[in-house]
């Protein structure tokens, strides 16, 4: 049923607006729906990899009450940070953007080149990996996806997603994808097809339930 999410008709327009804000020449890696403790792991692994300057990381914590906490974490590490809620334009020297706005998760995903879905590096069970697939973006996730296990396994089987063993592996996979536009495009096509082919789950469930509910009355 989680496949039946509504993608706004203007999602690409929203994404273009964010890309203009981020810088059209930047390669954008979105960390979506991250949970407590995951940002620190990802930042440490990302910085250790000494990434090229044109890679911009957009961090979107799962819970709004953690926005300030994550901003403080990044600042404490000396990271160049802009907050979505404050910035009219992101300087080219900025390494991280904190996605501290509400209702823009799909737009962040649509503006990404590569997406990592959080809640999966630590044993939280994962977050909704179908959202980035629905906007045609390559999706990555960690080892802990028990809340979305069937979707995660299906995404892997369809070539729409990649599973990382840990934060360092996630960074390595992301770097490979960011360096390979053709592979990103193919994964994005597969992700969109995967999401589209699984829509209609709610209608199918209702059709299955209807005669059974009628019999029970």
Name each model-derived stretch.
Residues 1-217:
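Nucleotide-activated sugar donor-binding and catalytic core shared by glycosyltransferases
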């Amino acid at each position: 049923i989680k496949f039946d999410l509504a993608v706004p008709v203007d999602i690409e327009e929203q994404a273009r607006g964010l890309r203009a804000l981020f810088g059209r020449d930047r390669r954008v890696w979105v960390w979506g729906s991250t949970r407590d403790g995951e940002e620190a792991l990802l930042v440490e692994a990302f910085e250790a990899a000494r990434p090229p300057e044109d890679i911009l990381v957009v961090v979107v914590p799962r819970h709004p009450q953690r926005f300030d906490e994550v901003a403080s974490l990044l600042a404490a590490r000396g990271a160049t940070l802009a907050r979505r809620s404050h910035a009219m334009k992101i300087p080219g020297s900025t390494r991280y953007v904190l996605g501290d706005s509400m209702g823009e998760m799909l737009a962040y995903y649509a503006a990404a080149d590569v997406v990592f879905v959080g809640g999966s590096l630590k044993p939280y069970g994962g977050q909704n990996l179908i959202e980035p697939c629905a906007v045609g973006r390559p999706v990555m996730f960690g080892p802990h996806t028990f809340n979305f296990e069937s979707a995660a396994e299906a995404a892997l089987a369809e070539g729409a997603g990649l599973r990382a063993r840990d934060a360092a592996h996630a960074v390595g996979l992301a770097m490979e994808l960011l360096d390979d536009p053709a592979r990103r495009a193919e994964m994005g096509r597969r992700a969109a097809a995967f999401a589209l082919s699984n829509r209609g789950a709610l209608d199918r469930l209702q059709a299955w339930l209807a005669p059974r509910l009628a019999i029970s009355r």
